[in-house]
Amino acid sequence: MVNLAAMVWRRLLRKRWVLALVFGLSLVYFLTSTFKQEERAVRDRNLLQVQDHDQPIPWKVQFNLGNSSRPSNQCRNSIQGKHLITDELGYVCERRDLLVNGCCNVNVPGTKQYCCDGCLSSGCCSAYEYCVSCCLQPNKQLLLERFLNRAAVAFQNLFMAVEDHFELCLAKCRTSSQSVQHENTYRDPIAKYCYGESPPELFPA
């Protein structure tokens, strides 16, 4: 009887250790993701500070990812999505289908490249990841170049900091002011992530 009780106790203790381990790993993952997202937001807020420029802005954006010095088997991605992730090649996938090298698994049926699901003709999308993926389409280059040439002073520092098409789309979809009607009100509460030049249609309050 004593041996049976000891065995049951050991099993319970082992399960508690497993649960504690799972909880600890989940907590570390959550804190890491939150820290990265906050770090990026702080960087953007700092870059948005207005400065005067007497000369044309020396844009550094490179639209040809093939010239990148980054290893070809590694991908940057949008990082913070809870369910979806977009990699720098324009693929959107579920977070569970993200490979260890940071790229979406293109062999999974749900992975799509240059996906504009939920995006309007104005260039505003219902999901951040689809906004970035759609923005990465090669035919969006001229639109983005026009935007860079007309960027408001308040955004000049932000977009001077980006170096390629992917970074530009990440910043454009995340910081667009075109989707905002008032400080805490979106013109379209659904399609609020914008890479385009035109604001979304204004929804009545």
Curated annotation (Swiss-Prot):
Q: Name one Pfam family in it.
A: SPRING1
Q: Which UniProt keywords apply?
A: Glycoprotein, Golgi apparatus, Membrane, Transmembrane, Transmembrane helix
Question: One GO CC term of this entry?
Answer: Golgi membrane
Compartments where located: Golgi apparatus membrane
Outline which residue ranges sit on the Cytoplasmic face: 1-16
**Topology of the protein relative to the lipid bilayer:** Single-pass membrane protein
- Entry's Gene Ontology BP terms: positive regulation of SREBP signaling pathway
At which residues is glycosylation annotated?
A: 67
Coiled-coil ranges (or none): none
Where, in residue ranges, is this chain on the Lumenal side? 36-205
The superkingdom listed in its UniProt entry is Eukaryota
* Family under the similarity heading: Belongs to the SPRING family.
Query: What does the function comment of this entry state?
Result: Positively regulates hepatic SREBP signaling pathway by modulating the proper localization of SCAP (SREBP cleavage-activating protein) to the endoplasmic reticulum, thereby controlling the level of functional SCAP.
Q: How does it assemble?
A: Interacts with SCAP.
PANTHER family membership: SREBP REGULATING GENE PROTEIN
Q: What is this protein called?
A: SREBP regulating gene protein
Recorded source organism is Bos taurus
